[in-house]
Amino acid sequence: IRRIAIVENIIYNNYLEKNENAPSLEEMEEFKECIPWICLKGLVWASENIYIKNKAKDEIKEIILDNPIDEYKETRRMKRHFYLHVGETNTGKTYSSIKRLMEAESGVYLAPLRLLALEIQDKLNSENIACSLLTGEEEDIITYAYHVSSTIEKLQLGTPYDVCVIDEAQMIADNQRGWAWTRAIIGVLAPEVHICMAPEALDIVIKLIKDCDDTYEVIRHKRDTELIVEDKKFNLERDVKKGDALVVFGKKKALAVSAQLLNNNIKTSIIYGSLPYSTRKKQFDRFLSGETEVIVCTDAIGMGVNLPIKRIVFLETRKYDGVSMRKLRVSEIKQIAGRAGRKGIYDKGYVATTKDIDLIRDALKAKPKKIEKCYVGIPESLINIDIDIIDALKTWSSMSLKGFYEKTDITRIIYLLNRLKKLDIDVSNEDIIKMATIPFEENNKTVFALWEEYCMMYSAGAVNLMKPTLKKNASAKKELDELESYYKSLDLNYSFGKNFNMMINNRFICSEKENTANKINELLLTNLLDHERVCIGCGKKLSWDYPSDRCRMCKIINDSKKERYDYRFRERRHADYRKNRRRRRY
């Protein structure tokens, strides 16, 4: 036992040298809960899992307020009135709110997407109302403007406005981004606040307003155009009509469908999530001008520009959500299908699908489940705590909240913080949290590598931020992906430089983004057939949803070759096994 104790002591002293925040042996002895665990699991385990976590909990309890609304003291001194615009998609909720925003001397529009923020900025500026833009990826600050169009995460809480418009408030239920809607509702400094939402969000928003001791009134918006679900299953080869929006879930599928239709002499506009705003706008304009008669899109069509779409067609009724393939939710079907039948252009809107007609029909009749919880983000006071930031966040996340509040999902943030830890990034807690919450696409390898490079540059004290470079000589099929990655890298270059006051070349970024967006649009016009699905064996054309990379004949031949190879491999293994047995015998 003595030897074990001596070795354990040596190991822990080495651990203390590497971890400054770890407790001394005397501190752990004073903490009675640690003693039985030291005997069972050892000093290091007891330090990390018992002492630090419990100490963190005690410190966090002291600094975190019981009610999230108390964080916004200046707002609590203001008397606010809320106008709650409730209705399904395409009912004019946002239109009514923006009208009021335009009448005010100063105001802010808070959007769920950069696309919507840009759209509203364009709208206000076209009406001679100077409006700035503020998003995670770009800014367009007009010095004399009293109106701001912003993504909701970029709301400047200390700035007072006459009118605030919060759009798509049902996203308060999103476990990663919902905190931004909660923060805006309880923290925005505006005496008049308009909130646009789907019906399922009404109850939770009212609870928040009552918790703030503010007043409200509900304005219900009804759909004027009837929405009809077609009984007949849709066939892509023969049923496409002018004014259709064909919905799939994935960029590759959208490109494959468009290529297949182009082969049938049907020109399309293409809309998907990673498409730059200016490219997307050009695709919209082609549809609006009649140059194309059909839109092929992902669920990105669910929010944004109201286009003259007569019929929404679900080419798929299942989507991959990052974990598994699942059926579309009621709220998703309503959001997308609601785009059919634009008010003032069509008297009726139509919805069709290639399969699962009952799923679509039932979803449109159903009432979505009411939202019962709203999410809160990481409190600012937590960032200044004298504990390892990862331990502090994990401990905070495990602590329960009172009432209808729920903590935001910090899985992504913890993952990025651990990556920074491996890179030995030595910056303040405030800066490291800023690094982990900066908007960028971590699933894109090129962009992720650039983010790591930028974090290391800042940590090393660099002043100038390295420009991203475009990978050249990419194949025709990969060129689109490379251009989109480059555009995202330019976004990251701008947002990182702005967040950390590093020197960036604004003129270069704007010029490169414009050129890249134009090149992407050109590729969608000229190289679309490169994305047509063909058999990798013989080159035969395949349908966009064909279940294999090979045509039927090539698959049969390939499978038989594989069977013969597997048979030979098994025979060879058996022969080697028998040979080795004979050798061992002698």
Residue positions per predicted region:
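Conserved interdomain linker/interface between the two RecA-like ATPase lobes of SF2 helicase motors
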Residues: 83, 199, 203, 208-260
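Conserved Walker A/P-loop ATP-binding site and its immediately adjacent core
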Residues: 91, 95-98, 103-126, 201
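Inter-Walker segment of RecA-like/P-loop motor cores
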Residues: 124-160
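Post-DEXD/H (motif II) to motif III coupling segment of the RecA-like Helicase ATP-binding lobe
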Residues: 170-222
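Conserved segment of the helicase C-terminal RecA-like domain
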Residues: 199-201, 307, 311-367
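Conserved helicase ATPase core of P-loop NTP-dependent helicases/translocases
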Residues: 133, 139-141, 256, 270, ...
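Conserved strand-helix element at the start of the C-terminal RecA-like helicase core
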Residues: 106-120, 194-196, 239-264, 268-272, ...
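Non-catalytic terminal extensions of ATP-dependent helicases
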Residues: 1-62, 379-586
